[in-house]
């Protein structure tokens, strides 16, 4: 896409928020110390500290340097607890303000540190510990999305009508909860060559994942999972006795909930099925090379091919304005839900996850759609524009969506505009948040949300490495 076409088509540059001078309240007059003091940090990485020092020295924008120092190490500073369990590393990772470990969040929170593992042995052990802990959780319950450190604890959702066990914080079935640990494991292996975490227990966890995905294709019935909660929020429970609305068995995998932890409308969640295709193939390669398990590898690849073909047949619809685009959810009967949500996997994030090429014509059309006001969860205000979702509600933009917009862009102006927007909307706190009001960044949710912080740090470091001129 040439620059003229981009400027004409992108909502980004049609929004005054991106072209106007920085908002007066966007940044504090100076940049006070808001990072946790060194003595109180949960974990310190020499390699990450060197990266922070380099960024602060080379990047002349003082506010971006300040934000990078605060956000990039947020996961290490505040959310990880590392120990050796016997002779194996073991790492518990909370989300921030919620003392529970999500399989998704914990994977995403440590993801940007993978490139530093060869330089930092303690950091490598920390990430290996995350993989080991995730393995134990998948073995415990592959349908659960979040767990406690204490395996005997019963929490606030213990009365949910599903097969809750002690130690499980929440049991919302989300495809991506099983994809993220594979993504982390595969890229850890690629980055380090270390096969120690991928023992018989890890291999069994992969088999649990394969079995669960097949169960949720619902070819022979509704499967073993159901979920109901007594709640005033329709997005926190499932209709029809806890199974969700009917789907036609076409080869796709059901996801009862989205990565936002909101219930799906149609259970074939398209971004998560794309993610599953990638993860199944990564797991197949590992089972083949590390375990010599050709049978499981073949089954994983066969399922990946089946889901991939079903996506081609059922996930693409004709939009009257944008042409062929990916639906967010489908049911196999012909019904579809057009939207996108800020949480990853999203339609916007598909190239970031390695699920589609950024140049794919259907993705390009989809990108235009989700970043337009045709997407019911794209909000544009006087302070910002970006994707939100039903989890927080109307008019609340998620910084994660702005970060992901930049991470999936090949246009320098768009990347720079997104970075500037994030710089101008931290509400004076020095950190990213779950969401903020489109007209007032000081009205935000979740002051301590490590995933959003670390993801923003990933964007800044990537931009510094590849296109430092955009940080000026």
Task: Label every model-predicted segment.
Residues 161-166, 171-174, 337-357, 395-472:
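C-terminal capping/lid segments that line or modulate ligand- or cofactor-binding pockets
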Residues 12, 27-104:
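Low-complexity, Ser/Thr/Pro/Gly-enriched N-terminal "stalk/linker" regions
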Residues 103, 138-143, 147-150, 156, ...:
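Extended ligand-binding clefts on enzyme/binding-domain cores
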Residues 76-89, 152-161, 246-258, 428-434:
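Active-site-adjacent bridging/hinge elements
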Residues 5-26:
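N-terminal export signals
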Residues 67, 122-137, 195-214, 283, ...:
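Extended, well-ordered alpha-helical scaffold segments
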Residues 99-127, 131-235, 450-466:
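Aromatic-rich carbohydrate-recognition surfaces in CAZymes
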Residues 47-60, 108-121, 180-195, 274-292, ...:
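Well-ordered alpha-helical scaffold segments within catalytic/enzyme domains
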């Amino acid at each position: 896409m040439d620059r003229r076409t981009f400027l004409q088509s992108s909502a980004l540059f049609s929004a005054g928020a991106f072209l106007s001078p920085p908002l007066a309240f966007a940044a504090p007059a100076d940049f006070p110390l808001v990072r946790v003091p060194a003595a109180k940090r949960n974990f310190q990485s020499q390699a990450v500290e060197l990266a922070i020092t380099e960024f602060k020295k080379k990047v002349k924008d003082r506010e971006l340097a300040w934000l990078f120092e605060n956000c990039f190490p947020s996961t290490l500073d505040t959310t990880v607890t590392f120990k050796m369990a016997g002779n194996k590393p073991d790492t518990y990772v909370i989300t921030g303000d919620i003392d529970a470990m999500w399989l998704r969040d914990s994977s995403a929170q440590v993801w940007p540190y993978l490139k530093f593992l060869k330089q930092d042995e303690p950091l490598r052990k920390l990430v290996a510990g995350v993989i080991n802990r995730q393995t134990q959780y998948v073995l415990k319950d592959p349908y659960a999305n979040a767990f406690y450190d204490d395996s005997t604890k019963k929490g606030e959702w213990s009365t949910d009508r599903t097969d809750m066990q002690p130690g499980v914080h929440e049991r919302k079935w989300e495809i991506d909860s099983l994809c993220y640990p594979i993504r982390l494991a595969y890229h850890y292996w690629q980055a380090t060559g270390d096969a120690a975490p991928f023992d018989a227990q890890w291999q069994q966890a992969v088999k649990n994942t394969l079995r669960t995905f097949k169960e949720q294709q619902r070819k022979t019935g509704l499967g073993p999972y159901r979920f109901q909660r007594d709640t005033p929020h329709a997005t926190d429970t499932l209709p029809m006795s806890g199974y969700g609305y009917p789907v036609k068995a076409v080869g796709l995998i059901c996801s009862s909930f989205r990565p936002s932890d909101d219930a799906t409308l149609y259970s074939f969640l398209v971004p998560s099925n794309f993610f599953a295709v990638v993860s199944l193939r990564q797991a197949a390669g590992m089972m083949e090379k590390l375990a010599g398990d050709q049978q499981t590898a073949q089954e994983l690849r066969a399922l990946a091919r089946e889901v991939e073909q079903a996506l081609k047949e059922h996930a693409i619809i004709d939009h009257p304005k944008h042409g062929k685009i990916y639906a967010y959810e489908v049911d196999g009967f012909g019904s579809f839900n057009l939207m996108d949500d800020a949480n990853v996997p999203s339609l916007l994030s598909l190239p970031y996850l390695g699920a589609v090429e950024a140049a794919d014509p259907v993705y390009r059309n989809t990108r235009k759609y989700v970043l337009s006001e045709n997407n019911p969860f794209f909000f544009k205000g006087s302070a910002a524009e970006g994707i939100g979702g039903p989890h927080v509600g109307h008019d609340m933009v998620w910084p994660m969506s702005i970060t992901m917009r930049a991470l999936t862009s090949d246009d320098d102006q768009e990347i720079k505009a997104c970075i500037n927007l994030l710089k101008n909307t931290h509400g004076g706190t020095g950190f990213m948040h779950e969401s903020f009001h489109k007209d007032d960044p000081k009205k935000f949710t979740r002051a301590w949300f490590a995933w959003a912080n670390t993801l923003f740090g990933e964007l800044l470091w990537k931009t510094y490495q590849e296109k430092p001129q955009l940080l000026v």
